[in-house]
Amino acid sequence: GKVLQITFCVVILFSCAFFTLLYWNDNKYKNDPNEGIRYLYDNWEFYYGALLTPQDLKNGDTKGAYMEYVTIGEVNNYSNHNPYRGAHGCGTYVLHLKLAAEKTRYAIEIPEIYSAYRFYVNDELIGQCGEPGESDRNYQEGIQTKIYSFEAAGECTLLLETRDESHYYSGMTYPPALGEESVVLHRV
């Protein structure tokens, strides 16, 4: 009787201590692995049928394309549910961000974009995957997830010139993830 009661109390105490330790150190609701990561899925400007550079936008030259707002992940091709638009071709995605006032080193994970792109931060070409080309004749597919690092402060513009002529999907179908460089690299 008495030994069983003592054993029961010891098991309860160790269990409480163990679960408290798990709560503080391994709680999926407390320690969010994505803390510090911002998924960039909404408020993207999209220009269908045009590959626009930062300079084009500064000059107000959209090459005849009109701007519409899109949410990344809502559709999986350029048609954007418009029956009069093709699912393939090209388009430019633009996102304006307000970042920390002091210059900070950021990293952005760009998931696979179908099927080629050039990526600019403000006016600087940061990276490229495949070759969007100026037409479907000099386009080269290059589909892969990449991480790019850059420094920025305050107002920041992300721009992706994209083209797809060959895949089932087209354009940006998954949102990029942005955060301070150490946070993004630690997550991956």
Give residue ranges: language-model regions.
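Aromatic-lined ligand-binding clefts that engage carbohydrates, nucleic acids, or primary amines
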Residues: 97-99, 104-122, 158-162
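Soluble extramembrane domains flanking the early transmembrane region of eukaryotic membrane proteins
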Residues: 89-92, 101-105, 112, 128, ...
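Extended carbohydrate-recognition surfaces in non-catalytic/accessory domains of CAZymes
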Residues: 1-7, 15-102
